[in-house]
Amino acid sequence: NQSGIARGLYGMETLNRIHQKMAKALGEQGGRIDAIFFCPHGPDDGCHCRKPKPGLLHEISERLKVGLAGVPVVGDSLSDLECADATGALPVLVKTGKGPRTWPKLEAAQAQGSLLQTLVFDDLAAFTESLLRGDLESAITTARGHVSAD
């Protein structure tokens, strides 16, 4: 969600510069970004792509011709996790950005029986390391409530 565009806080040029900076930093570490998807709408625009609605993930799935079942979707907000869960993807919370504020909300949701398969990592680097080591599979199969996989 990039509602700052709809609210006039910044424009596409600024967002593009942010994306370019992110891609450059990742490229310097040997990584790459193949595509960036985002919702530019505000909370009251009634679009299908604003999280927690799953429209954006469905669009990604269609464009890339891949299924979403079990695909890790990493985020720092409850709406990120709910969006992933709504598509059958694997919700992954990182405890950076909004993550520390989201953690108690996740625990409350799990107490109500939702988002039980959510994995939790300290940061994106910890998630990436686990993914590259192949450790996610064991974390997924043992997930009961939240799993701190860091």
Where are these regions (language model features)?
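Short linear capping/connector segments at secondary-structure termini
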Residues: 1-5, 38-43
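A short secondary-structure junction motif
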Residues: 2-15
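Asp-based, Mg2+/Mn2+-dependent phosphohydrolase catalytic module
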Residues: 12-35, 42-73, 77-150
